[in-house]
A protein has these predicted regions:
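Structured helix-beta-strand junction loops
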Residues: 51, 77, 150-151, 196
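Active-site-flanking alpha-helical
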Residues: 75, 169-170, 203
Length: 212
């Protein structure tokens, strides 16, 4: 089976998929898709994902979009990040759904206002939107921080794909100025993820390629 990962590595959602594939050593071809040049709006990419968003996993005659769906699919290909027990696997899925519904939107607001707008020349951050983002961030961070107390990982005491999913937005913690000072459990847990070889490999891929 031939797989291609179409992604923009600096994006947390692209990073999520790339880091899972790297950790599991899933054979694939990586296709760098430059968001800054509008690659996602081309007819070729739209055929893979009509939403015109990254990342996308492309197989032989099929494609899969939504970063958590891709990450979980990759975790089924090799053992290591997805429990075999049905209840434990449901717990992983539960936290990945939470990442999509609560954690990612909270982080994404701050990332957009404090980093993306400036990067793309979209002007300064909107204070009202930043305040909304901070409210959402603190609400979600309190849940995550409390859950991590006494735990090394999100689910069942072992590293799972849920850790990669929830940890991915934190690669933007510095430029987006995430207020993590009140959340020591998140900082401790994230330090473990950041030390993973696959995490470091994916971070290195996030460097924008130089023009030819």
């Amino acid at each position: 089976m031939s797989l291609k990962i179409h992604a923009f590595p600096p994006s947390p959602r692209g990073f999520k998929v790339i880091s899972v594939a790297a950790h599991l050593d899933v054979p694939h071809e990586f296709v760098f898709c430059d968001l800054t040049k509008g690659v996602q709006k081309t007819p070729e990419f739209t055929a893979l994902n009509p939403n015109q968003r990254m990342p996308v996993l492309e197989g032989d005659g099929w494609s899969l979009w939504e970063s958590n769906a891709i990450a979980q699919y990759l975790a089924t290909l090799k053992p290591g990040l997805l429990p075999m027990d049905e209840k434990a696997r449901a717990d992983v899925t539960r936290w990945m759904f939470w990442e999509s519904s609560d954690w990612d939107p909270a982080c994404a607001t701050l990332i957009f206002e404090r980093f993306v707008k400036g990067f793309f020349g979209g002007g300064p951050a909107d204070p009202a939107e930043v305040e909304k983002g901070l409210t959402k961030f603190h609400r979600a961070a309190k849940v995550l921080n409390a859950h991590l107390k006494g735990r090394n990982y999100i689910c069942g005491g072992q590293l799972t794909v849920a850790d990669f999913s929830i940890g991915a937005p934190l690669i933007m913690a510095v430029p987006a100025q995430f207020p993590l000072e009140d959340y020591p459990e998140i900082r401790r847990w994230y330090a473990q993820l950041a030390a993973l070889p696959a995490w470091q490999k994916a971070l290195a891929m996030g460097q924008m390629p130089q023009a030819a």
